[in-house]
Design a protein with these regions (language model features):
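Carbohydrate transferase catalytic cores enriched for Leloir-type hexosyltransferases
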Residues: 1-250
């Protein structure tokens, strides 16, 4: 990481001056050059207490460098556009929107061998969710809904740190919730294609790509009525209160 910072703060500005080039940063890069535009995908660390102190400080520095140096800032939803303007004091007319895409799913061939790893999961009979188990993804909602619906099956793929659910004593596999851990793009495609409903209970998102991938593969989706999700998915989705555990999934 030290090499990355040295490149961004010293090598890159010198190169841009020497070649009269213009820099487009797509990953919230720290900047010390005005010959640039950059993308802030979201500013969650500034609005949610879900990250460690040093990471939050480092992210603040990244955002301030964007505010001071970038000629223009892009983000991935109007929700984030207004949030960035509010929290960082960047004028709205300096912030553009460029949405994420789904076309990468065209090149993915579903790998149905994933079902061999979960013999208790039947095609077309499970609810599926994908993402890291970070707190803002709110996968606690799925665990609580699963407890209230013991006759339904849930699959949650992604990082497998179950402590993200809160109390370690509560973070245990249950008879109707399956955690395959990390899945490949091909395995994910198979799980999306055959799910009864794709669930996305996140309470904060800059965009939320997994529901878009699920739609691209023909899966029905149900999303939290929070953050940018209603803006982006409109009437293509069902919505639920991410703090209501008695929701009707049928």
């Amino acid at each position: 990481k030290a090499v990355k910072y040295f490149y961004n703060l010293a090598v890159l500005p010198a190169y841009l001056r020497r070649t009269h080039a213009f820099y487009v940063g797509l990953a919230s890069d720290m900047l010390l050059t005005k010959r640039s535009v950059t993308v802030l995908h979201d500013i969650r660390p500034l609005v949610m207490d879900t990250d460690k102190g040093f990471f939050r400080f480092k992210f603040w520095v990244h955002c301030l460098s964007t505010k001071w140096f970038a000629q223009r800032v892009f983000t991935v939803s109007d929700n984030q556009r207004h949030l960035i303007s509010e929290k960082l004091g960047i004028p709205l007319n300096k912030i553009g929107i460029t949405y994420n895409g789904w076309e990468h799913m065209k090149g993915v061939t579903p790998d149905e061998s994933i079902f061999e790893k979960m013999p208790g999961v039947q095609k077309g009979e499970y609810y599926y969710a994908l993402g890291s188990l970070a707190k803002h993804k709110n996968f606690k909602w799925i665990r609580e809904v699963a407890r209230r619906n013991p006759d339904k099956t849930f699959v949650v793929a992604g990082g497998k740190d179950l402590r993200a659910f809160g109390d370690d004593n509560e973070a245990k596999d249950t008879h109707n919730v399956f955690y395959p851990g990390y899945v490949s793009d091909a395995e994910n495609a198979a799980l999306m294609q055959h799910c009864k409903l794709f669930l996305h209970p996140a309470v904060f998102e800059g965009f939320g790509i997994p529901p878009l991938e699920a739609l691209a593969l023909g899966a029905p989706i149900a999303l939290a009525n929070a953050t940018c999700l209603p803006e982006l998915y409109g009437d293509t989705a069902r919505y639920f209160d991410p703090y209501d555990y008695d929701v009707d999934l049928d």
